């Protein structure tokens, strides 16, 4: 998708080709599911869903939260129930994908919207931490595994943030400072490094 100028172009490219995901089955015969978000610099969003080998594409600025299970339309139906119930009094609190989706949707709708980059990073990071599955969590459910990393982007300032749960820091790449022209040298970020400040 790095060949596309914006979300509509990426969606058109995906619709032109018969993309599939192939992979191993997991416990109890479950297959790989994937929800993949695309947002361009104008805030146009799309979500690409691979469900049982079939690609579904949903577009709209209301696509803000993604988890891998269940399929997107079912997830929205579950979320609609909780929106009507009201999250002020009760929110689902398990580590299941639907519960984490509902919490992410609720908090995104009820936090301050800010143009200040650092505050926006802090707010977004706090929501992502709230919907993460703790590292090393095990319960034997084939559909739940611990969160390995979290990522988000500031599309206005062209910064891509991510943290890996085994590294106590957070990384970001300032795409405005990267040479992304064809033929430019390959860049690599060593995510095993940490910085200590005393």
Q: Where do the model's predicted regions map?
A:
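Structured, non-membrane catalytic/scaffold regions adjacent to prosthetic-group chemistry
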Residues: 1-60
């Amino acid at each position: 998708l790095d060949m596309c100028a914006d979300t509509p172009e990426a969606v058109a490219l995906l619709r032109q080709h018969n993309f599939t995901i192939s992979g191993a089955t997991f416990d109890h015969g479950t297959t790989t599911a994937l929800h993949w978000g695309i947002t361009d610099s104008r805030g146009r969003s799309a979500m690409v869903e691979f469900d049982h080998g079939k690609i579904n594409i949903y577009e709209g600025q209301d696509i803000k939260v993604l988890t891998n299970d269940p399929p997107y339309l079912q997830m929205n139906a579950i979320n609609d129930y909780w929106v009507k119930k009201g999250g002020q009094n009760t929110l689902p609190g398990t580590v299941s994908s639907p519960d984490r989706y509902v919490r992410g949707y609720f908090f995104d709708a009820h936090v301050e919207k800010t143009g200040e980059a650092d505050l926006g990073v802090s707010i977004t990071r706090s929501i992502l931490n709230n919907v993460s599955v703790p590292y090393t969590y095990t319960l034997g459910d084939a559909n739940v595994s611990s969160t390995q990393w979290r990522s988000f982007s500031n599309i206005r300032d062209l910064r891509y943030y991510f943290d890996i749960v085994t590294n106590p820091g957070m990384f970001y790449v300032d795409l405005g400072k990267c040479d992304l022209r064809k033929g430019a040298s390959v860049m690599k970020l060593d995510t095993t490094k940490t910085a200590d400040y005393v």
